[in-house]
Amino acid sequence: MEVSERPIGQGPRVTVEAVGRKCPIPIIMLAARLHEVPIGAVIAVTADDPAASADIPAWCRMKMHEFVAEHPLDRGSAFHIRRMY
């Protein structure tokens, strides 16, 4: 599992690379890394499993975090999530 960090104010603070992993693995990886960003910061998950487009926003609603956006990539998408608590 790769994680990259960025300074505050320059997009997601952490990106979790889940390309090539099938759901629910991207969500499990997100949940395991979410505590690494401060409350109010954005974490990104890159994934290419088509189920991630529905599963990640649903997980955000269930866990009461903010689903910010889905950005298409050459392979899959980047899902941005704001940590709310």
Model segments located where?
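Short, compositionally biased "basic patch" segments
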Residues: 1-11
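Amphipathic, hydrophobic secondary-structure cores in small proteins
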Residues: 16-71
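A residue-level signal for beta-strand positions that form part of recognition/binding surfaces
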Residues: 13-15, 78
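C-terminal structural segments of small proteins and small subunits
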Residues: 5-6, 57-85
